[in-house]
């Protein structure tokens, strides 16, 4: 997901650069080709609209960056909560001497999708818990 965010940021930067170039080129063309023509007011109005569009675009970029940062923070928080929950589950299993049953195919598929979407989650915790293997107290203390 971060690669997609970086790609979008690069696209926004390129679009910003393209807008700057277009504005410069239009101003140059108006000065050179139409110094006293009747169409000059229209060209100026277009340039003002281009500036307004650029301002709105920059505001959108700023909001996009804010959303991106918040999204990363939320993802980190979810991963931390999930890791803590899995550790608590392991401790509860240890205290009650219970083991998880093996997962169904559907549950395994969901687990794999979760791992692929949230790589920050400690795979050791998820793998061992979801596979139903018993975890020793030493592993729990190490946070595995």
From Swiss-Prot:
Q: Which family does it belong to?
A: Belongs to the SKA2 family.
The entry's cellular-component GO terms read: centrosome; cytoplasm; kinetochore; meiotic spindle; outer kinetochore; SKA complex; spindle microtubule
Q: How does it assemble?
A: Component of the SKA complex, composed of SKA1, SKA2 and SKA3. The SKA complex is a homodimer organized around a central W-shaped coiled-coil structure, formed by the interacting domains of SKA1, SKA2, and SKA3, each end of the 'W' is extended further by the C-terminal microtubule-binding domains of SKA1 and SKA3; the complex forms extended structures on microtubules. May interact with NR3C1; the relevance of such interaction remains unclear in vivo. Interacts with the MIS12 complex subunit DSN1.
What are the record keywords, sorted? Cell cycle, Cell division, Centromere, Chromosome, Cytoplasm, Cytoskeleton, Kinetochore, Microtubule, Mitosis
Task: Indicate yes or no for the key word Cytoplasm.
Answer: yes
Entry protein name: SKA complex subunit 2
* Organism in which the protein naturally occurs: Rattus norvegicus (Rat)
Q: What is its main location?
A: cytoplasm
Q: Is Cytoplasm one of the keywords? A: yes
The record describes the protein's role as: Component of the SKA complex, a microtubule plus end-binding complex of the outer kinetochore that stabilizes spindle microtubule-kinetochore attachments, promotes alignment of chromosomes at the mitotic spindle equator (chromosome congression) and assists suppression of the spindle assembly checkpoint. Kinetochores, consisting of a centromere-associated inner segment and a microtubule-contacting outer segment, play a crucial role in chromosome segregation by mediating the physical connection between centromeric DNA and spindle microtubules.
> Where would you find this protein in the cell?
Cytoplasm, Cytoskeleton, Spindle; Chromosome, Centromere, Kinetochore; Cytoplasm, Cytoskeleton, Microtubule organizing center, Centrosome
A GO MF annotation of the entry reads: microtubule binding
- In terms of superkingdom, the source organism counts as Eukaryota
Residue ranges annotated as coiled coil are none
């Amino acid at each position: 997901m971060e690669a997609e965010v970086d790609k979008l940021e690069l696209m926004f930067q390129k679009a910003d650069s393209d807008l700057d170039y277009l504005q410069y080129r239009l101003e140059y063309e108006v000065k050179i080709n139409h110094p006293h023509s009747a169409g000059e007011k229209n060209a100026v109005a277009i340039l003002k609209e281009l500036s307004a569009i650029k301002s709105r675009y920059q505001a959108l970029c700023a909001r996009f960056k804010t959303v991106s940062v918040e999204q990363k923070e939320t993802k980190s928080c979810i991963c931390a909560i999930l890791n803590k929950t899995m550790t608590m589950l392991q401790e509860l299993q240890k205290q009650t001497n219970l083991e998880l049953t093996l997962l169904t195919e559907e549950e395994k598929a969901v687990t794999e999708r979760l791992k692929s979407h949230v790589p920050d989650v400690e795979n050791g915790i998820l793998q061992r818990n979801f596979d139903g293997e018993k975890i020793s107290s030493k592993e729990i203390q190490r946070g595995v």
